[in-house]
Amino acid sequence: MKLTRPKLIETIRRKNEGWTTYQARKIAGISIRRVNQVWNEYQLTNQVPDIGKKNGRPPKHVEQWEMDMVRQTYQKYRVSADTLERLIQRDFEKHIGHNRIHRILLILGFAKKKSKKDIRKKDWIRYERRHSLTAVHIDWHYDGKTYVFAVIDDASRKLLALLECNSATTDYSIQGMELALQQGKIRQCISDHGAQFISNVDGDSRFKAFLLQKGIKQILCRVKHPQSNGKVERWFECYDRHRSTFETKEEFVRWYNEMRPHRALNFEVLETPAQAFIRKMKAEA
C-alpha cells in the first residue's frame, strides 16, 4: 500500500500514543523499517516528514567533460547507454552510469524519452552456428529509395557483402554472393522464397544453379515465417537507423564490422563482428 500524508500523520499519532511499531505499520500497510524511518525523522525535527517523488537527493549537475565524452563516444559507436557505459570505461578509464549517460543523450538529442518503464528482458535461446562461414543469411530490403542486398554470417554476425541497387534482381544477388565468397568457402545459404532466389514455377533458378556450382547448400525459410531469417531482418533495422550517418557504404560496413560491439557476441569484452569472425573461424585440418 502507498504511504499517503494522512496515513503518515495517523501512524505518527498512534506512535505518540504508545502503539508498537508493528501495530502502527498496519495503518498504511508499510514495513516496520519504513515506520522506524519516518518516526526517527519526526523525533529529530519534531515535524511530520515530507514524502513524495520530489523529496530525494537533487540530481547532480552534468559537467561539460561528461557531455563531451558521451558525445564523442556516441558519434563513434552509435550504441545504447548501457553499451556506452562499458565503452567509456574501456576507452577513457572513466565511469559514468548508464542512467546518467541516457540523461546526457536526451540533452544532446541522441535519444528519445521513453513513453513507458522498461520491462525486464527475459533470457532467450539463440540458435547459431559454431563456426564462421558455416551458414549465411541473405535478403533484399527496400528503404524507400534504394534496394539493399545483405549477406550476414550466422556465427559472427559479420556483414560479408552489401549492395545498394536500383532494383532487386537475381544478377545482383549472385554478385553479392560472389563478394561474400571472397571471405572464404560458404557451406549453407539461408534465404526466403523471394523471386530472386527461387523460381515460382518449379523451384529452380539461376541463383540456385550458382549456389550448386559453388558447392553451397540452399536452405529456404518457412513461408510467412520471417523469424527464420531474423538475423538479417534485424540487421536491416540497424541499416535504416544508421546508414544515413555515413557518406559511403564502405564507411558504414567498416563501422558495423570493426567498431560497433555486438550484444549477441562476447559482450563482456565488447567484441565486434570482425573479431568474432576470426575467433569462430574453423581451423582447417
Listing of model-derived features with the role each one plays in the protein:
Residues 2-19, 67-76:
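Short, amphipathic alpha-helical "recognition" segments used to contact nucleic acids or chromatin
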Residues 22, 33-36, 99:
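Key DNA-contact positions within bacterial/archaeal DNA-binding proteins
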Residues 23-28, 84:
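Short alpha-helical "recognition helix" segments of helix-turn-helix
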Residues 49-69, 73-135, 205, 272-278:
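Basic, flexible linker segments flanking DNA-binding modules
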Residues 94-95, 99, 103-158, 166, ...:
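Mobile-element integrase/transposase regions
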Residues 197-241, 273-275:
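RNase H-like two-metal-ion nuclease catalytic core shared by retroviral integrases
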Residues 214, 237-285:
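C-terminal domain-tail junction helix/linker
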